[in-house]
Swiss-Prot record:
Name recorded for this polypeptide: Light-harvesting protein B-870 alpha chain
Segments in the Cytoplasmic topological domain: 1-12
Subunit structure: An alpha/beta heterodimer. The core complex is formed by different alpha and beta chains, binding bacteriochlorophyll molecules, and arranged most probably in tetrameric structures disposed around the reaction center. The non-pigmented gamma chains may constitute additional components.
Source species of the chain: Rubrivivax gelatinosus (Rhodocyclus gelatinosus)
InterPro entries per record: Antenna_a/b (IPR000066), Antenna_alpha (IPR018332), Antenna_alpha_CS (IPR002361), Light-harvesting_complex (IPR035889)
List of residues binding a bacteriochlorophyll: H29
Primary location recorded for the protein, binned into one broad class: membrane
Chain positions with N-formylmethionine modification: M1
Role of this protein: Antenna complexes are light-harvesting systems, which transfer the excitation energy to the reaction centers.
Its membrane topology: Single-pass type II membrane protein
Length: 67
């Protein structure tokens, strides 16, 4: 295993690993912020309350004739 470091510079390998892990962390956090469930900045968006649609009453004939 020690011979691998004769091929690669240890400092460059650690810097490359740190840059890769930082990029991966940023990517994961941005993906989570894009979801509704895991967005900790805006909070979870609540579903709109279901409203019952009332039927429109038919025109009353006695009021229509009074006009």
């Amino acid at each position: 295993m020690w011979r691998i470091w004769r091929l690669f510079d240890p400092m460059r390998a650690m810097v490359a690993q740190a840059v890769f892990l930082l990029g991966l962390a940023v990517l994961i956090h941005l993906m989570l912020l894009g979801t509704n469930k895991y967005n900790w900045l805006d909070g979870a968006k609540k579903a709109p309350a279901a409203t019952a649609v009332a039927p429109v009453p038919a025109e009353v004939t006695s009021l229509a004739q009074a006009k």
